[in-house]
Amino acid sequence: LDGIYVSHTDEDHISGVRELLEFVEKDLTSLRIENLILPKWSDIQENKNYRELTELAESAGVRVLTVKAGDEIRYGTVRLKVLWPESTASGKEVNEDAMVLEMISKDFKGLFTGDIGMVTEEKLIQNGCLEDVDFLKTAHHGSRYSTGAEFLEIVRPELAVVSCSATNTYGHPSQDTLERLKKSGSRVLITRDCGAVTIVNGKSVSAFNRIK
């Protein structure tokens, strides 16, 4: 893998990455990871997950990169624009300080929003960095406090994926959020129902549910 992007350090966003890094560290897999990319936060002293994840990556021989709004990473013809966090982010509000990425290739634009809420969506709107996209990774598992109507009027995704567990106790995804997505004209896939979603070259979409 060229890189694994971690939007923020809540346990439900890093547990799988941690396990994978442990396998690499112990040489239990042939998989190799070049980079671990994290949001650049000014205050990580009290963020145990952040510190331990970076230490594990370094022990596994994986380069750790931190990014902020305005940074850009390229893989051939693919560009990854970092829209958030802002340069002054402390990381104390892990959801609102989460990494937001726009992926741009020849025929595809995708937006990955971590667990940000409408507060950060409004800041992104004010910054003028949002645009119409083909794909949206819906923020915060479809929480009612994310993916607002004004935000959707700008990004207008053709496909929106909501990542959530069938057994989550938070009521995700919110019916309000699903209605806003449908009103914006988006096709909606919920991993709770369809399993993992894979997009190839921005053209083909497939879902795979290994649980029968």
Regions found by a protein language model. Give the residues of each.
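Non-globular, low-confidence helical/coil segments that flank catalytic cores
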Residues: 1-212
